Amino acid sequence: MDKEKNDYDKLFSEITKARHLVAFTGAGISTLAGIKDFRGKDGLYKQPNTEKMFDIDVFYRDPSVYYGMAKEFIYGLEEKQPAIVHTVLADLEKRGILKAVITQNIDLLHQKAGSKNVIEVHGSPSVHYCINCSYTETFEETAKTAKTGEVPRCPKCGSPIKPAITFFGEALPQKALMKAETEASKSDFMLVLGTSLLVYPAAALPAYTLRNGGKIAIVNNQPTQFDSYTDLLFEDLEETFEEIDKRLKKV
């Protein structure tokens, strides 16, 4: 237990002395909020035909494939609440310690927790757009129709509405990716949280920090390719952030 306490003390020390702290988050922090991991053992991709859900060619042919599966998984997100990782990161930002959150997630829970500088490298459902014209609408506007399982359509031209999430077959949002690379390069300490670092190009972001002389800490329940680059390795996200939160409240 003493060793664990020392490890948490060391992690907290690195967090608070960092000049440019950045967090890089993945699906593991969403599972704490009751959202299934896409690739986990009970994840969405383990269910029949769900790989078609985020296939851009399938969407253009038949958008009902996406909306039929997404009505609960995506448009039920309004009912989900941030977990302790989300709330502690928001607190760190509010205190001026954390400079940016880079996330692979599409659940908007960082924003719901109060984080302001959130970079969504796989796109965001906060905006939906017509695939034919320039019309856009909010998540909430689209969700009204999407929750029924129907395909939301543009009020101007009648074409399907698509979330600004990156589907398979689409490029990542370049503006967000460039901003993420900039933040990772500036970071002298990066928290890698709940991601196994398997999906590129986002998985390479810790390398930007390391290349520029920064350090990383990894909190994930599975090994990653960057484990050998740090001695700050933790498995339990919830426990780790409870320990960070306890120390933060004493500051």
UniProtKB/Swiss-Prot annotation:
- Give EC number(s), comma-separated: 2.3.1.286
Q: Which gene encodes it?
A: cobB
Q: Name one Pfam family in it.
A: SIR2
Active-site positions on this chain: H122 (proton acceptor)
User: Which Gene3D superfamilies does this chain map to?
Assistant: SIR2/SIRT2 'Small Domain, TPP-binding domain
Task: Tell me what reaction this enzyme catalyses.
Answer: N(6)-acetyl-L-lysyl-[protein] + NAD(+) + H2O = 2''-O-acetyl-ADP-D-ribose + nicotinamide + L-lysyl-[protein]
Q: Which residues form the Deacetylase sirtuin-type domain?
A: 1-251
Cell location: Cytoplasm
Write out the function statement from the record.
Answer: NAD-dependent protein deacetylase which modulates the activities of several enzymes which are inactive in their acetylated form.
Query: What PROSITE patterns does this protein map onto?
Result: SIRTUIN
Q: What is this protein called?
A: NAD-dependent protein deacetylase
Q: Between which residues do disulfide bridges form?
A: none
Q: Which cofactor does it need?
A: Zn(2+)
Paste the cofactor note. Answer: Binds 1 zinc ion per subunit.
Q: Please list the residues that bind nicotinamide.
A: F38, I106, D107
What UniProt keywords are attached to this protein's entry? Cytoplasm, Metal-binding, NAD, Transferase, Zinc
Q: Name the CDD domains for this protein.
A: SIR2_Af2 (cd01413)
